[in-house]
Amino acid sequence: MTDTAPQNDPTTSHVLPKGIRFAGVAAGIKASGKPDVSLIVTDRPSVMAGVYTTNQIVAAPVVLTRAKTPTSTGRVVLTNSGNANACTGDEGMQNAKTMCDLAAKLADCDSADVMVMSTGVIGKPLPMEKVRAGIEAAAGKLGDAESDFIASADAICTTDQFRKTVSETVTIRGQQFRIAAMCKGAGMIAPNMATMLGVVMTDAPIGPDAAQASLKQIAGRTFNRVSVDGHTSTNDTVMLVCTGMSVSEDAKEFNSDELKIWQEAATQVALKLAKMLVADGEGAARFFEVRVSGAADDGDAFVIAKTVAASPLVKTAITGGDPNWGRIVSAAGYAGPKIEPERTSLVIDGVTVFENGTPLSIDAAKLSESMKANSEVLADLTVGDGPGKASFWASDLTEAYVRFNSLYTT
């Protein structure tokens, strides 16, 4: 996807949390020769939390890392790209454990303090000699410069057309705390959790239970509200790393009010990344936002918005710049939650096309031209007079997506 607002700006500088070093190297796991081993290492034991795929087919690194979080002694987040290490049996689990052991030795910590993530093709054994060499090479390049952060972010990518990184600062207790994040993903994006890998990092003082609860809420408002193709991966993982190194080791953790301020800032960081996932959707031409209001509650609104955004007929209409409002309204009708047809209205890119259950006379050709001329389409759907509201973001569905994914493993 090109010329889309949510894309990353390569000229943007990043403010990085204190106490974290980064590296990314090419180990030959990918046939392309692009970077494929990423290391993130904290200078001291740190809080780490995670949210993971809801797929019942779960990759070995997810099984291993999920059992370790939340923790207050985390030191390493190790990622390989180019191979998912999923559906690889006992060998895959042993390989994931070996990766942790190798990183632990190089970081001088326990294997239990290493979190591992993998992404790529499913069902192929990891080339462990290459993985081993990559981990050793990455350990030798660890640094805290922005270039090191970028190298680490590049190494987690697979079919991504651009890296996805964001950073922000938030002032709490009269001092600045830093939040930096990276993620990857362009296909198999239908998270709940997400089809993607991501790491959110901060130097704020947050305990393990608070970190886990915060990350779950952050993901629920961001990564769980995007879709490219409706396919949930076996490897989805988002990690939260909290070093606490903006304050002294004996400083108190954030209280509930302070945590809310930090969480809102982190949510905005994650939302920017989530929108980048959609903007970089495989073969995508347009970024599509569905806003639902008037539902019985936010949960119902979310289900309706997600159903509309996931509909292949809606997606293809967006691709063609076709203001086919009937597809959107009918998708809302089969979503499940109760709607009020006589109070249902739809606005596409500022043009009301359906109001209180009745279609309006519009210049469809003009609206189509507007949709085709823009890379973003907004649908505002009212389904009643209830308090529930939600947004969901998706990409369209193009011939390029079909062509790319029909040849992915061959």
From Swiss-Prot:
It is found in: Cytoplasm. The keyword Lyase does not apply. InterPro entries: Arg_biosynth_ArgJ, ArgJ-like_dom_sf, ArgJ_beta_C. GO terms for biological process: L-arginine biosynthetic process; ornithine biosynthetic process. GO terms for molecular function: glutamate N-acetyltransferase activity; L-glutamate N-acetyltransferase activity. It comes from the Bacteria. Substrate binds at residues 158, 184, 195, 282, 405, 410. It catalyses: N(2)-acetyl-L-ornithine + L-glutamate = N-acetyl-L-glutamate + L-ornithine; L-glutamate + acetyl-CoA = N-acetyl-L-glutamate + CoA + H(+). Pathway: Amino-acid biosynthesis; L-arginine biosynthesis; L-ornithine and N-acetyl-L-glutamate from L-glutamate and N(2)-acetyl-L-ornithine (cyclic): step 1/1; Amino-acid biosynthesis; L-arginine biosynthesis; N(2)-acetyl-L-ornithine from L-glutamate: step 1/4. Pfam families: ArgJ (PF01960). GO terms for cellular component: cytoplasm. Its EC number is 2.3.1.35, 2.3.1.1. It is an enzyme of class 2 (transferase). The active site is at 195 (nucleophile). The record marks 119-120 as: Involved in the stabilization of negative charge on the oxyanion by the formation of the oxyanion hole. The record marks 194-195 as: Cleavage. HAMAP family: ArgJ. Belongs to the ArgJ family. PANTHER family: ARGININE BIOSYNTHESIS BIFUNCTIONAL PROTEIN ARGJ, ARGININE BIOSYNTHESIS BIFUNCTIONAL PROTEIN ARGJ, MITOCHONDRIAL. This is Arginine biosynthesis bifunctional protein ArgJ. It comes from Rhodopirellula baltica (strain DSM 10527 / NCIMB 13988 / SH1). The lineage of its organism: Bacteria, Pseudomonadati, Planctomycetota, Planctomycetia, Pirellulales. The gene is argJ.
